[in-house]
Structures are given as C-alpha cells and as structure tokens.
Amino acid sequence: MPIQSTIFGLSGLSLTKSEKAFFRDANPWAFILFARNIKTPDQVKRLVNELRTCVGRDALVFIDQEGGRVQRLRPPHWTNYRPAGDFAALFKDNPTAAKRGVYLTMRLIADDLRSLGITADCAPVLDIPVPGADDIISDRAYGDSPKSVIPLAHAAMAGLASGGVAPVIKHIPGHGRATVDSHKALPHINTRLQELELTDFAPFNAFSDAPMAMTAHAVYTALDPNNPVTTSYDAITNFIRARFGFDGVLMSDDLDMKALSGDLTTLTENCLSAGCDIALQCSGVFPDMIKIAKGARACLLYTSPSPRDQRGSRMPSSA
C-alpha cells in the first residue's frame, strides 16, 4: 500500500490489535497524539516506536503542544508552559524580551518532544482574535495585531526548528474572527477581503514558506460562500496556494469536528480534492478511521516512502 494522505490518532496508551492491523494496512503518512495517549515518558516512547513499527518507517508523529490551555504533555513529567497571550502582553512593553521568551519556550518544548520521538508540533497559532469572537483562540494567540503575531510566531517557529521539531502554522487562513467554536459548529465569517488581507490573513501570507499548515474549519464568504475552507477548492487552491503562494504540506483540521457535516468518507475525498495534502482524524474512534481511510484511498497523493520527496523539501527528517 502506498503512503496514504492521512494522519490518525489512536484510542489509548498502547495500540490495540485492531489498530496495529489497521495502521499496517492503511499506511498513514503520520500519527498524532493526545492526552489520552500519554502517561509517562517511557510509555510515550514505547507508543511512538509501536506506531513507526506498524508502518515500517520513521513516520512523523504530531502533537498539540502550544503552551497554556493546549498542551498534551503536562506535569508531573513535563513543564506547564506559559500561553502565547502572556508573551503578547509582554511584547507591548518589551518586544525583544517577548521574542526571546517565545523562542526559548518553544526550544524547550522541542527538547521535550524530541526526547519522546515526537517530531512535529501543531503550533504556532497565527490567528488574530477580535472583540466578540468565541474564546476558543483568545490567549492562544500572539496578540490582536499582525504587528505582534508575526514576530512572535517567527520566534516560535525558530525555537521549534532549532530543536529539530517541525512547526505547523494554524489555522490557515485564520480562525480568530470566528464567533463559534468550530469543535461545536461551523463559523461563518462575512468580513470583506480587503480587511481580511490587512488583518487575519496577514500572518499566514507572511509565512507562506512555512513547512506545514493546518486549515480553519470556517466559511469565509469572501473566498467561498458555500463551503468551509477545508473542503473549498476556491479557498485552498485558488487563494491559499495561488494568492499566498503557500507550497508547504497543507493538512486539514480534525475532520471529526462538528463544524463539518456529512459522511466522513465523502468529507475526506472533498478535503483532498480541494487541495489539502493530508486529511487529519484525531478521535481514535475506529469506525471513523475506517471511513477516513476509505476516502483517502480514492485520492492518494503520496507514493514515495519519504515525505521529503513530495512538497516536503522543507520538511524535517523523522529520525
């Protein structure tokens, strides 16, 4: 089986027999871990090795380790890192100290991840929250303006990269203006394109050379009034690819989120056909994983055993 254009989560602290068989057959491009998969450093190392053994290669292993509310590795075994919002506040008084603080924080996070064999972090958040928006982003953001978000995100990416961990910018082209949480419902954003390009879209445009990005499950009426970004050819291919010039690996946000509706197999096909390289499925719910894999089989994008042979000229080695 060629490498499939998917990233899968899993159910627990170790692989079940069914998961092992599924991963061997589906051959996903990468894996992602959550708090339910994490107990101790030694246990995580064993799990990461199990995952790579299933696919017979050094597949990338992802995690969300932003600091603040979103960090899967927590005390007592790991440090509880500050949220991005703390550095945004510091930036107002001392930009140099804020940038240095972000760099060092993400460098330490990279050390934590690499020690476990985890090679990609779904961070930094480039979204810019606005008054009245849902608080799903809030202090996960590096401020309320591109003037702080861009330099602080640059420091975050540099910190991760210097520790050998690949950053994933999110949620392209922006989620900060959403008035509902896309884990629960589909946001609709009706702001004019000219305003978006000066605000929400500016950080993503600035990092068009990033190695990886994750989509926003949101409808931008200025880009496509009928489809969320994740399944929109106009938003992904005609705007993110053509207008931003983003040529890195583009992964969806979790296809199991409530923002998206419909059959998971069809959603996967639509996501990949729209221009996403990778369909992400996080829940570890086995029937859902089977549906995602079925959809991806119809849209195989990767046929080489190395992600570096594809869009990934800027991708890290997993080893």
In which residue ranges do the predicted regions lie?
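N-terminal hydrophobic targeting/anchoring segments and the immediately downstream early-domain regions
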Residues: M1-V61, Q65-H77
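Second-shell residues forming the walls of enzyme active-site clefts
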Residues: F8, L15, R36-C54, A59, ...
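Short, acidic/polar
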Residues: L13-F22, M106-I109, D263-T268
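Glycine-rich anion/phosphate-binding loops
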Residues: T40-Q43, K92-L108, K147-P151
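Glycine-rich, aromatic-flanked loop segments that form ligand/cofactor-binding clefts
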Residues: C54-T79, T105-I128, M157-P173
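Hydrophobic alpha-helical segments, chiefly the membrane-spanning helices
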Residues: S313-A319
